[in-house]
Amino acid sequence: MRLFNWRRQAVLNAMPLVKPDQVRTPWHEFWRRFRRQHMAMTAALFVILLIVVAIFARWIAPYDAENYFDYDNLNNGPSLQHWFGVDSLGRDIFSRVLVGAQISLAAGVFAVFIGVAIGTLLGLLAGYYEGWWDRLIMRICDVLFAFPGILLAIAVVAVLGSGIANVIIAVAIFSIPAFARLVRGNTLVLKQQTFIESARSIGASDMTILLRHILPGTVSSIVVFFTMRIGTSIISAASLSFLGLGAQPPTPEWGAMLNEARADMVIAPHVAVFPALAIFLTVLAFNLLGDGLRDALDPKIKG
């Protein structure tokens, strides 16, 4: 017995001591993976900067984005007074791009929020209960997927009328089936796991299983797809505004600014370049951020 205790003590003494701050939590592992991706980190910083600019755009903008007119410098290019130049009505483009970030980002984020809320609910129900409920939801999704997203959004706006609120609804509608399919697929896999059977065996209700066991298992996929979907929604909202179905002049929304710039693109290309560049960089940043989140959250990717 003494020999056994001596050996056990020797083994314990040989084991390295692990300090509390050296324990790797899931958050530490995620951050370790994510910070190694320089493109994703750059995109994350850009998105954070964009959010800050969008929140404080009205205070940051040097001029009123809607009611300031410099009639002496119509269509003038970038200068020290007007960093992005002036449009055909004398409005400062830099101020309008800043305020446009507020409108375009809000439209994209709110549309995806609606899509993820409804789509996640439908996906959980379809994947968990299956049967006729699953078939009904998936057939509706198939019908929505049969139409190009922008065409479906145009049809919705044509029924509801123009305006940024209706654009958000239209973009949200064609985001719903994408999230529903994603969550349904994850739910079908998770419901077969042994921990779900264990929860059922101790009498857990369907609601408890869905909210406490299955939904947390789908969060990482939802976060990644949510991030990447924001870029798609911003493009869709800008496209509708460009077609005259979204934000209406003089609202400084990026798509609406491109619509107004069409007549002056030849003589004053800067009027269209800066709103287009804002859309391009924003969408690129969200896509790169989504790629980085996917790589950091996927346990199959080593590094």
From Swiss-Prot:
Primary location: membrane
Homology family: Belongs to the binding-protein-dependent transport system permease family.
Any single Pfam family the record assigns to this protein: BPD_transp_1
GO cellular component: plasma membrane
Lineage: Bacteria, Pseudomonadati, Pseudomonadota, Gammaproteobacteria, Enterobacterales
Protein name, as recorded: Glutathione transport system permease protein GsiD
Compartments where located: Cell inner membrane
Role according to the record: Part of the ABC transporter complex GsiABCD involved in glutathione import. Probably responsible for the translocation of the substrate across the membrane.
Molecular function in Gene Ontology: dipeptide transmembrane transporter activity
